[in-house]
Swiss-Prot record:
One Pfam family here: DUF134
The protein, known as: UPF0251 protein Hore_18270
Listed SUPFAM superfamilies: Sigma3 and sigma4 domains of RNA polymerase sigma factors
Superkingdom of origin: Bacteria
Family matches, as InterPro entries: RNA_pol_sigma_r3/r4-like, UPF0251, WH-like_DNA-bd_sf
Species in which this protein is naturally found: Halothermothrix orenii (strain H 168 / OCM 544 / DSM 9562)
Family indicated by similarity: Belongs to the UPF0251 family.
Length: 135
């Protein structure tokens, strides 16, 4: 009996979840599905430039598992580009990383989703409603 898949830690959920070749009606396009953890593997390795060991550590998987996820993602992207297919980002076995935050005003410690760490997002303290908090 197969072991259930372990959830991979993901720091980023893409806002745009669908790409398609220009000039082809949606009804005529076949799709390739990229899981959220495959998108995360591409982001960490190819965009952030981390080593495979650093990527595996961030995603809380072994290095060989990370390599399999990355290879699968790259193959799917290549297939979509070469064969003119759309890319859809959805699904998978993942958990959204949490960021530990401490309120400057009252000292309360709380968690927010990791993707809210960007400079334009606000992290309000649930105790005093202050938004000046640190990671």
């Amino acid at each position: 009996m197969a072991r259930p898949p372990k959830e991979r830690r993901v720091e980023y959920i893409p806002e745009i979840r669908y790409f398609k070749p220009a000039g082809i009606p949606a009804r005529d396009i076949k799709e390739v599905n990229l899981s959220i953890e495959e998108v995360e593997a591409i982001r960490l390795k190819d965009l952030e430039g981390l080593t495979q060991e650093e990527c595996a550590r961030k995603m809380e998987v072994s290095r060989p598992t990370f390599q399999r996820v990355l290879t699968g993602a790259r193959e799917k992207i290549a297939r979509a580009l070469i064969e003119g297919k759309a890319l859809r980002f959805e699904g998978g076995d993942y958990k959204l990383a949490k960021l530990h935050v401490k309120c400057h005003r009252c000292g309360n410690k709380f968690e927010v989703p990791f993707h809210h760490r960007h400079r334009f997002s606000r992290r309000f303290c649930p105790e005093c409603d202050d938004e000046k908090n640190e990671e």
